[in-house]
Amino acid sequence: MIKNLVVIESPNKVKTLKQYLPSDEFEIVSTVGHIREMVYKNFGFDENTYTPIWEDWTKNKQKNPKQKHLLSKFEIIKSIKAKASDAQNIFLASDPDREGEAISWHVYDLLDQKDKAKCKRITFNEITKKAVVDALKQPRNIDLNWVESQFARQILDRMIGFRLSRLLNSYLQAKSAGRVQSVALRFLEEREKEIAKFVPRFWWTVDVLLNKENNQKVVCANKSIPLVLREINPELSASLKLDFEAAENVSGIDFLNEASATRFANQLTGEYEVYFIDEPKIYYSSPNPVYTTASLQKDAINKLGWSSKKVTMVAQRLYEGISVNGKQTALISYPRTDSIRISNQFQSECEKYIEKEFGSHYLADKNKLKRHKKDEKIIQDAHEGIHPTYITITPNDLKNGVKRDEFLLYRLIWIRTVASLMADAKTSRTIVRFINQKNKFYTSSKSLLFDGYQRLYEEIKPNTKDELYIDLSKLKIGDKFSFEKISVNEHKTNPPPRYTQASLIEELEKSNIGRPSTYNTMASVNLERGYANLVNRFFYITELGEKVNNELSKHFGNVINKEFTKKMEKSLDEIAENKVNYQEFLKQFWTNFKSDVKLAENSIQKVKKEKELVERDCPKCNQPLVYRYTKRGNEKFVGCSDFPKCKYSEFSNPKPKLTLETLDELCPECNNKLVKRRTKFNAKKTFIGCSNFPNCRFIKKDNAAEFKQ
């Protein structure tokens, strides 16, 4: 007899939870993710009731070929049902979001009626003993509003994704479209258009560098003193006929052509005299709040150089628990959240740590602490922001005890969390003004008065040597400095940058598109489909991606756009809050969407017949050549229109031949000639092997240790 059965979705959590729940009272089992899916037939829902149609679990006996070590869904469900029948209490403890709520509902729905009465739903935002024990003390019923919101999202994605994917596959040989992925693709295409139509503005500046010494007094220890031109002598400007701009929003003088800048620079001679020193101005820099999913993705991608997928994977490991000094420990709170809230208890623990390690003067002013505020955007399921589970476990404690990736991401999260509750940094900025032949210049000196939260970033912050510090105690009005260098420099405005994975996620979040659980796929799915490539971390849309976006925009512009997707996310939130009936919502959308699809099918079918001809014939069968796309969709090539009867093809970047040259030397095993070949996976590496491969697998001894056929 099992006293308490705890059902979770991830097998990786089992080991962590077992430390907190005594084995004689609790048994923990995992669903290994979603326990059942909608059927694929008819998009997986009933068109009369708009309810999901679930697959028959008794027939799902096939194992995932990539995870053969795991049980099939049939075996998992059968095991859970058997254990549930033998249990006194059943705690459904899947993740604290809508996906997790749906997983718990599926387990509940599959149980025998007598076992359903034993079920209670529990959630915890972090896997610590206190959080788990507290959750067991506060069980609740499954929130059917959350479940229905997840149903609606799943059906909506099927409605849009399946129908559009079929159209694209038949017309463009493109693999898929989707409610959110296609909006992300549209962002990429719109940015390409902005770049294409961008016209740069050119201007020139006259930049002066002064020697850092004045009468053998070094006033600037780390570098020369750079001056910014602020005002030109009117008489000089008139005599030289200078073309320049000194707009209010420009800090210096912009010359409109190089000739004017050069004429002015040639007039600058002699010494530069200090004529005024402004009163210092005090500036305060506040720390950022704790991480959300989107801000963690952005920072980890930018600072660690990771992909969005990697950030998600490592964060999940830290949440579920890893081995720390031989003990399984969950290190961070739930990593899928759009909240910046933290509990009062955790805040108190952090403040005690800060006071102990740095002193009470490093604590943030209570009146200035940024509290969690709800704006128009709904914070999904009232999670906390991402933070360490134990603030006393510092990054240094983990440095040599966990994987490098786990350490780096934990360090980002730990520093951001502690810094969010520390005092502002305080900086003084003083403007020093110089004059030369009635032309006025200035420079600014910065000095850090109190480091505050920035103290935590000393080890990982960028180099700040470029910041200018002038020892004002050694400087007075009337001091004169000689120039070290005067230069004329060209500048131009740059086009908007292409998106990186980080900036795309940031843009999608700003537009209220997607949810924390989907940010990873939103950034990566267009790469996987061949609609875009990453070059030096920037997205470049492919020709196929352009065609897909153009067709979707042409026929489904009312669906594949930012405002519609934002509206859909809001509707899903309203379903979760019991403000909207999910079946009525789906019915209204499906009725309108089907008519759009019908119109698009007629239009696309007409275009489909018009193949893109190359205007020459196949050299093998004399049929016309046409343009095609590779299976992945990211490479265009020339192929025969009579495919598959004729398989002739031409690639603009053909794969290098593996065989480089035939040698005079014979194979000692089969007497065929030896050849020099490239390795299959690295074209730069070569080896010598038998030309009779694969019948003969001889490799010359010098290479045998490195290459195996």
UniProtKB/Swiss-Prot annotation:
Annotated region Interaction with DNA: the residues are: 176-181
Q: Where are the zinc-finger regions (C4-type) in this chain?
A: 618-646, 667-696
The record's catalysed reaction(s) read: ATP-independent breakage of single-stranded DNA, followed by passage and rejoining
GO annotations of cellular component type: chromosome
> Domain Topo IA-type catalytic spans what residues?
143-598
In the record, biological process GO terms are: DNA topological change
Quote the InterPro entries the UniProt record gives: Topo_IA, Topo_IA_2, Topo_IA_AS, Topo_IA_cen, Topo_IA_cen_sub1, Topo_IA_cen_sub2, Topo_IA_cen_sub3, Topo_IA_core_domain
Q: Does this entry carry the keyword Magnesium? A: yes
Q: Where is this site: Interaction with DNA?
A: 34, 153, 157, 336, 529
| Keywords, in A-Z order | DNA-binding, Isomerase, Magnesium, Metal-binding, Repeat, Topoisomerase, Zinc, Zinc-finger
The record describes its quaternary structure and partners as: Monomer.
Give the record's family classification: Belongs to the type IA topoisomerase family.
Q: Which NCBIfam families does the entry link to? A: topA_bact
> Function, please?
Releases the supercoiling and torsional tension of DNA, which is introduced during the DNA replication and transcription, by transiently cleaving and rejoining one strand of the DNA duplex. Introduces a single-strand break via transesterification at a target site in duplex DNA. The scissile phosphodiester is attacked by the catalytic tyrosine of the enzyme, resulting in the formation of a DNA-(5'-phosphotyrosyl)-enzyme intermediate and the expulsion of a 3'-OH DNA strand. The free DNA strand then undergoes passage around the unbroken strand, thus removing DNA supercoils.
Q: What is this protein called?
A: DNA topoisomerase 1
Q: Which organism is it from?
A: Mycoplasma genitalium (strain ATCC 33530 / DSM 19775 / NCTC 10195 / G37)
By which gene is this protein encoded? Answer: topA
